[in-house]
Amino acid sequence: MLIYACLLFAALMLVLTKVPVAWAQQRTGRYDNHDPRAQQRELTGFGARALAAHQNTIEAFPLFAAGVLVSVITAPGAPIATTLAVIFVLVRLGYWGCYLANIATLRSLLWGAGYLVSLTLMAMPLWM
């Protein structure tokens, strides 16, 4: 049930990608837990990239989760679905790393790959 582990890990990435954001906020003097979004709007450089990567992780998760659920319902146990889920997780980890390291072109390519993986998972009923 590796596909479920990928879904769980993708959900955990919603929290993991917040860690560098919180670190960047802390570096400004203190983490403002009363109004963290206002503090986040002030981030620049690494902090701004970390925030953008975190926000995109939140945006990418629902499409991936829907794709996994569609594939599990329509093609239970299909090896291609599991392979695609693993690829998604690896691509998103690479995307996150590229965003933090400011490697824009590769980051964009990885974003596109992750998006295509999610769409492919959702489209599986069309050929399975």
Task: Go through each PLM region and give its residues.
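Cytosolic, membrane-interface loops and tails of multi-pass inner-membrane proteins
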Residues: 22-52
